[in-house]
C-alpha cells in the first residue's frame, strides 16, 4: 500500500504553510522562526538539528542481500515445489532422487533471479548517489559577531540566513528577505523551461492569487536553482518538511502491482488451482482401482510435480535478464527486471515535452514588425538591448545573441545606462549612444506591459499613433504567435537628446513600438520519427507537461503528434475519477499539470485497461513514474525521479524507447511460449493419466519416470529466452490474459491426449504390454512418445505460422530440443533406464512413433488455425 499520507494532502499542507509565510513582514517572520538577520548561533543550530534532523530528502535504499534472496523464494511455484519435495522426502526417505531433482531446479531459478536483481539494484544505487553541495549562510560566531560561511547543505536548519547567487542550487525551502533581479529555474518541479522571477515582499511584489505553492513569488523551493540575480533568504523548512520532501514521502511504501506482476500472479494461481483439483482425482482413482494407497500417493505427488511449471520463475528471469543485457548495449540501465516485459505490453506512453520532444534550448524563432512580417530591424533593436545589459543574461537574451552575429552593429554604440528587469514591470531597458547628439532608450518586455508605455507604432517607414484599435491589432498578431507555441516580447525605442542624467523607470514612457521577438524551444529532429515508430507498433503517445498549452500543442504538431484534445491541470482538478477516466482516452495533451495530477492521469489510463509508460526527469514527475507500469527516466534526472523509475536512459532519446518496446515484446512472447506450452501439455498429460489410471491394472508411468521425463522437458525449455519472434507479433502491444491461457489449455491440451491414448492402444494390443509383468514396456513406450510430443509442441506453439516451413526456431532452440529428443529415445537402452524401470523397445515401435508424431503435428496445426480464426490471437 502507499504511504498513509496522500499526495494531495501533502501538497495542500505545503501550500498552506508556504502561503502563511509568503507575505509576512520580515521582522515578524524572523521572530516566529526564532531567528535574526545576523544569523543563528551554534547552540540554536545544534538544537534544531537534533529536533528536525539533517537537511536531506530520504530515498529508497536497496534491501540487504539476504532480504533480496528471501524474496526470490516468494513465488507460488517455488513454494509448491518445496512443499512437494518435503512431503516426498518424509514419505520415502530412502529415495532422494525426486527431492534432489526438485531442489536443483528450485536452486537454479532462485539463484539466477537473486543474482540479476542484486546486480541491477547495485547499479541503480550508484546512479542515485547524491552530489554533495554547500550553502552560503550568515551565522554568529562564538564572540557574537556575524560571519558569512560555507556549510554543507545537510547542516542547514530552520531560521538560517542563506545568501544566493547565480548558479546556486536552492538548498531548502526559503522565504526571500531581499532580492535583486532574481530568476529561478523551477523546471525540475514544473517542467517549465523558462525561469520565473522571485522577489522579496515589498512595494513591487503584492500578494497574488496563487493556484499552488510554486506560484508564490516570494518563496524558493529546495531543488530549484538560481539562473540570475542575488538574494538573501531565511530557511522555512528542511529535509522531509520541504516541498521536495513532501513529494518524496508520497513515494514511500510498496509499489502498485504492474500488469506484469498481475499477469504472472493470475497465471500462477490458475495453474495451482488446476493442480489442486486434478492431483486428488488421480490419487483417488489409482488408490481405489489398484488398492495400493502408498503407491497411488507417490504417483499423485509425481503428477503434482509434473503439473507444476517449476521452470516458470527461471524462464521469466532468464528472459528478463537477457532483455536487460540487450538494453544495456543501447545505453539503458534496467533497474527492475519486469519493466522489460512492461515495455512490450505498453500501449500508452506519457511523456514530458521539454528535452524529450524538444531540445530543451530556447531559440529565437521569429523577429517581426507590428504587422507580423519578418523584420531585421526588430532583431537589431532586440540584439542591442540584450548585448548591453550588464546583469546575467537570461535564456531569451542568449537566444537573441546567438541567433545572428550583429556585433558589427553593436560596435557602433556604447552603454550609457540601464533600467534592470523587475517583477512588476516585466521589461528591461538599456540606454545607448552612437557618439552623436542623441541617445537611444531600447526596451523589450511582455506584450501588455510594453503596450502600456508605448504611444506610437512603426511599421516600415510609417509611424502612427498607438490607438486602441492599433493595440487590438498588435494583440491579435501576438496571440497568433502564441497559438503557434511562441513566447513573444515586444521591442520599443525612444530617441532622447544627449545628456548626463540618470535614467529610471519613469523614463519608460512615450516609446515607439517597432516589432516583436518570438521564441521557441524547438523540437528534436528524432522526435517525429520516434513517434511514428511508436504509433506503428501500437503505442499511443500523450504529452503531460507543466508547460503551457499553446506551446505544447505547437510542438506536438511539429513532431507529427495529432492532438485530438487538450486539457490543463485546473480542468483535471475539477473532475472526479469517472469523468477523468472518460477524458484521458480522447485527450492527447495535458498542460500545466502538478505532480499529483500527472499521477492521477496515469492511474486513470490504467483503470481504462491500458499498460502505461511514463517518461520524465523532474521531481514533479516522480509520483507518476512510480505509479506507471513502466517508469522511464534519464541519468541526468533528479535523484527522486531516478529512484522512482524502472528504467534509466543514458540518452534522452525516444528512439531507444521503440527498441525497448520491441525487446519487451520478444521477452513477453517467449514467456508466453513457455506458459502456454506447459499449460497445454500438462492439461493433456493429466487427461491421459486419468484415462490410463481408470483402465490399466498398473501405473501408466512410475513416479521416478515422471520426474526424469519432466526434468528432460524442462531442460528443453532453457533455450526459449534465445528464440526469435515473428514480425507480425511485434506490431502490437501484448498483454496478459489468464482467461486466454485457460482457453488455450482446453483447446490444445486434449490434442496430445488423443495420441497418448493411441499409444496406449498400440502398446496394449500391438506390443502386448497388457499386464503388470509387461508394464515396463508400456511405460517405456509412453515415456518416449510423451517426451517427444511435449518437445515438439515447443515448435508448434512458438509461432502462429506453419513451423519449420514458414517460421524456423532459433539455432539454440533447434539444437536443444533435438538433443533432448535424442537423449529421451536412448534412455530405455541405458543403465539409467534400467534403474528407473524401463526396457528397450522393438524397432517397429519407432515407425509407429514417427507416424504418431506426424499426425500429432498436423492435428495441432489444424486446431491452431481454428483457434486463431475464432479468438484472433495465438500467443
Predicted regions and their residues:
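Alpha-helical transmembrane segments of multi-pass membrane proteins
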Residues: 71-91, 106-110, 132-133, 269-287, ...
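Transmembrane helix-loop junctions at the membrane interface of multipass transporters and ion channels
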Residues: 690-698, 765-766, 803, 826-842
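Cytosolic catalytic regions of ATP/NTP-dependent phosphoryl-transfer enzymes
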Residues: 36, 219-227, 342-512, 519, ...
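Hydrophobic alpha-helical segments characteristic of transmembrane helices
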Residues: 52-138, 240-242, 248-329, 339, ...
